[in-house]
């Protein structure tokens, strides 16, 4: 029985992880569940899965949870608890599915504690990739990616010599606004941006998909995960979401991971690696119904997020921190109705153009850069609100 700590158990990835654990209750047990403030869902999960420990990072929500919780799990409150709970002896594997750089310190602590690691948090590598890779190398930890694209790349590299890689082909669905012009995007609302054509995801990830900032984050993530130069990472649009990503080798061979879009598949593989279990949905591709596989290049003039991601990544140091933090602030402002959809790109571009990259030397340096980038982005947002 493998004991799993699910950090972010009430979110989109977290609930689908719990689905996988439910399907394979003979193999897995959720020894730890953790959420920010979704305590009703957390209470339901506690009743069903009987964890040994529960973490609520929001203080107020944690206090409210304790008022009605009558189970026997250890209840820990506050963000710092995430970094403590991953060290528990009753944890074999940590799946990090919290949002934002909140995931960085628990990831580092899980590696230091010798735990298996499944990573679903893009920001951890985008902001702190240098730190995470250094610790992973030191402790001989294999980072198992949960993102469908990075899982696909990971699977396409199994048994291959990394020196033989020519290029990573990172696929994107194109989001709800694929093929739109700048003029057509000028009046986009939050409701419009939440209509993803393929995946059912949380709000932040769905909005990032609409702007293609998610793909920008994934470019930087792929660089760190697989040690591939930015010039050898190419984004392509595959609107059917059948090809989840590909690896092209120096002899011209392309290895691809293809399958129906179901996030439980990469989650399950991260938990069972190197073994495979039956499909959670028991659904398979019916090739007789697929007349063609569509491939296109992304419009990097409309979706400047991709160009900005490459720029941020090539800055090295804390360029990724600035990219991520300014995007998060811009998304918040868009949701609040303070800026337009297209202004999201402007805020990140302005932040990066005024950014002087510094080395990432510690967790504290990441937090410092994050605060600086948010302040800079907020200043640009304020000007756009005038």
Predicted regions and their residues:
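Catalytic, metal-anchored helix/loop core of enzyme active sites in primary metabolism
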Residues: 1-386
């Amino acid at each position: 029985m493998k004991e799993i700590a699910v950090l972010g158990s009430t979110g989109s990835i977290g609930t689908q992880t719990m689905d996988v654990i439910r399907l394979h209750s003979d193999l897995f047990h959720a020894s730890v569940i953790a959420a920010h403030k979704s305590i009703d869902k957390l209470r339901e999960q506690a009743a069903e899965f009987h964890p040994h420990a529960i973490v609520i990072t929001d203080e107020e929500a944690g206090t409210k949870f304790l008022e009605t919780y009558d189970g026997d799990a250890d209840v820990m409150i506050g963000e710092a608890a995430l970094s403590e709970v991953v060290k528990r002896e009753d944890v074999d594997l940590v799946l990090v599915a919290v949002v934002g750089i909140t995931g960085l310190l628990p990831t580092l602590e899980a590696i230091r504690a010798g735990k298996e690691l499944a990573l679903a948090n893009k920001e951890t590598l985008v902001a702190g990739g240098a730190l995470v890779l250094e610790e992973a190398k030191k402790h001989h930890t294999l980072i198992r990616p949960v993102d469908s694209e990075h899982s696909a790349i990971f699977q396409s590299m199994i048994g291959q010599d990394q020196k033989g890689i020519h290029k990573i082909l990172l696929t994107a669905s194109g989001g709800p606004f694929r093929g739109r012009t700048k003029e057509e995007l000028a009046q986009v609302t939050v409701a419009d941006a939440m209509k993803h054509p393929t995946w059912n995801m949380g709000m932040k990830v769905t909005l990032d998909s609409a702007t293609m900032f998610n793909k920008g984050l994934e470019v930087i993530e792929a660089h760190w995960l697989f040690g591939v130069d930015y010039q050898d990472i190419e984004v392509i649009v595959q609107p059917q979401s059948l090809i989840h990503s590909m690896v092209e080798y120096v002899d011209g061979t392309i290895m691809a991971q293809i399958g129906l879009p179901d996030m439980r598949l990469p989650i399950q593989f991260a938990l069972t690696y190197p073994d495979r279990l039956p499909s959670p949905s028991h659904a398979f591709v019916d090739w007789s119904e697929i007349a063609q596989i569509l491939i296109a290049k992304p419009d990097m003039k409309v979706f400047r997020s991709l160009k900005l991601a490459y720029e941020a990544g090539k800055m090295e140091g804390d360029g990724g921190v600035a990219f991520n933090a300014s995007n998060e602030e811009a998304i918040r402002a868009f949701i609040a109705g303070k800026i337009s959809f297209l202004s999201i790109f402007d805020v990140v571009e302005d932040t990066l153009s005024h950014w002087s990259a510094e080395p990432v030397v510690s967790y504290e340096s990441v937090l410092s850069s994050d605060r600086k980038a948010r302040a800079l982005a907020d200043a640009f947002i304020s000007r756009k609100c005038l």
